[in-house]
């Protein structure tokens, strides 16, 4: 991190039974404990697999992860096989998911929601459409929502419009190759107040955090827009472990 001139990074540490196997809510706690001595360098994003747990279990794990110091919550519809708006009565009426959003709103935790496709063999990509997040934005207006990957590669226009019209929806740019960023998001500068840099390391095609960041810094948009995306906005939204409970 020092070599890349990065103060701290966000680490996704959420359960994934269907895709990875025996990776449960306890995994979040293990990751937090592993980096506790470097709490100023890491922000841990936890989560619960809402369609695998009872309401009481969801409450238990949310509280335990919060007390341990999570900086945000991650929902992965494509890997968890659930719509982001599945709590709605006309959808699945999944109270466990509603509880997650309410908890995050009450505790001022941002929520990352995966959008776009996944190459995982058991992924259900139909759940990656960002339009389902629109309901969440309306129903939880005080919740900070971060659309991970901005719907890439097939729903990016939908994601862009949601960032523009919904004040509590932000765009996470991770996993979009910096060299192709303006092909995917040609009007990136217009949403620089609501966009957040990310690498998705060690995800597909991302082999080095420093190299990825350096490529991003070369994107031909105004310098103040770059600074907002790589520095100002992440610091505002995602706090390191040392700043939490």
Q: Would you name each region that the model predicts?
A:
Residues 21-25, 55-59, 130, 157-159, ...:
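Conserved strand-to-helix beginnings and helix N-cap segments that scaffold or border functional pockets
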């Amino acid at each position: 991190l020092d070599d890349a001139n990065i103060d701290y990074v966000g680490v996704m540490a959420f359960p994934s039974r269907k895709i990875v196997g025996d990776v449960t809510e306890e995994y979040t706690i293990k990751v937090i404990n592993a980096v506790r001595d470097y709490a100023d360098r890491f922000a841990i994003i936890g989560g619960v697999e809402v369609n695998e747990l009872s309401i009481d279990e969801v409450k238990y794990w949310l509280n335990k992860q919060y007390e341990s110091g999570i900086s945000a919550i991650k929902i992965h519809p494509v890997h968890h096989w659930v719509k982001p708006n599945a709590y709605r009565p006309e959808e699945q009426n999944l109270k466990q998911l509603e509880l997650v959003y309410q908890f995050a709103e009450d505790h001022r935790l941002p929520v990352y929601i995966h959008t776009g496709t996944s190459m995982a063999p058991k992924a259900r990509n139909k759940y990656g459409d960002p339009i389902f997040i629109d309901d969440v934005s309306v129903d939880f207006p005080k919740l900070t929502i971060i659309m991970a990957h901005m719907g890439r590669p097939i729903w990016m226009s939908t994601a862009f419009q949601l960032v523009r019209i919904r004040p509590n929806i932000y765009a996470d740019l991770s996993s979009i190759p910096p060299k192709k960023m303006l092909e995917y998001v040609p009007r990136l500068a217009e949403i620089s107040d609501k966009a957040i840099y990310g690498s998705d390391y060690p995800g597909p095609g991302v082999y080095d955090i420093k190299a990825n960041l350096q490529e991003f810094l070369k994107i031909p948009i105004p310098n103040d827009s770059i600074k907002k995306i790589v520095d100002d906005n992440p610091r505002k939204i995602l706090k390191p472990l040392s700043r939490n409970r």
